[in-house]
Regions:
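A detector for small-residue-rich transmembrane helices and their helix-helix packing motifs
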Residues: 2-218
């Protein structure tokens, strides 16, 4: 009987212990992924509702941005305005996380929160997720305050903070997670971060890289 030669490029077979460990990891991950994520849904809905209210409040159409066409709305909407923050309105470093400039801005951030939020909420629980979200968003707004003079707002800083959390989680628990998940949480995130930061340097796009980087490294 002819026995075929093994493929030298084939990955080594798992031992029984390694196989059982891999199955156990998949089961643990499956249980975690079934956990409900109510806070993520609440945050997405809250951000969208605030944008809808601001949109009609500013009486805008198309791609016009109410905050840059209506000085009163800049003052009352909760945006990060450096002069007002310096005058003592530090609450804007928190409120600005929930204020978005146009439909593309809210759509991009709502989608990012919808994708990344459930993972962080499931891995850390809703209380720590809320703390991480607000802390990252505030750190992003603070970085924007020091490095970007223009008024700004949005959940981008908080979302980049979630990216940072998942990167750290993927590295820290790389031996406990299935390899495909660990790789997705680390190497899979880097191209997206590089692309998002890169387009932020384009003059044609009003993106606040100060908030993005502040949230990411918080």
């Amino acid at each position: 009987m002819h026995t075929p030669n093994p493929d030298p490029n084939a990955p080594p077979a798992l031992s029984p212990e390694e196989y059982r460990d891999a199955i156990a990891r998949e089961k643990r991950l499956g249980a975690v992924l079934k956990t409900p994520t109510p806070l993520t849904k609440i945050l997405v809905v809250t951000n969208v509702l605030i944008w809808v209210v601001a949109f009609f409040w500013g009486d805008t159409l198309g791609i016009r941005t109410p905050y840059f066409n209506n000085a009163q709305l800049v003052l009352f909407s909760g945006m990060k305005v450096n002069e007002l923050v310096a005058a003592g309105e530090w609450w804007r470093l928190v409120s600005s996380q929930f204020v978005h400039l146009d439909v593309m801005h809210i759509a991009f951030n709502a989608y990012g929160l919808y994708v990344l939020g459930p993972m962080v909420e499931r891995f850390y629980g809703w209380k720590r997720f809320l703390t991480l979200y607000l802390a990252s968003g505030t750190a992003g707004a603070l970085a924007s305050y020091y490095f970007v003079s223009a008024p700004s707002g949005g959940a981008s800083g908080a979302i980049y903070g979630l990216v940072g959390v998942l990167l750290v989680f993927g590295v820290k628990y790389r031996h406990e997670l299935p390899k495909r998940v660990s790789k997705a949480l680390t190497m899979g995130m880097l191209p997206w971060v590089a692309f998002s930061i890169g387009i932020g340097f384009l003059d044609s796009l009003p993106m606040d890289n100060g908030a993005h980087l502040g949230g990411l490294f918080s």
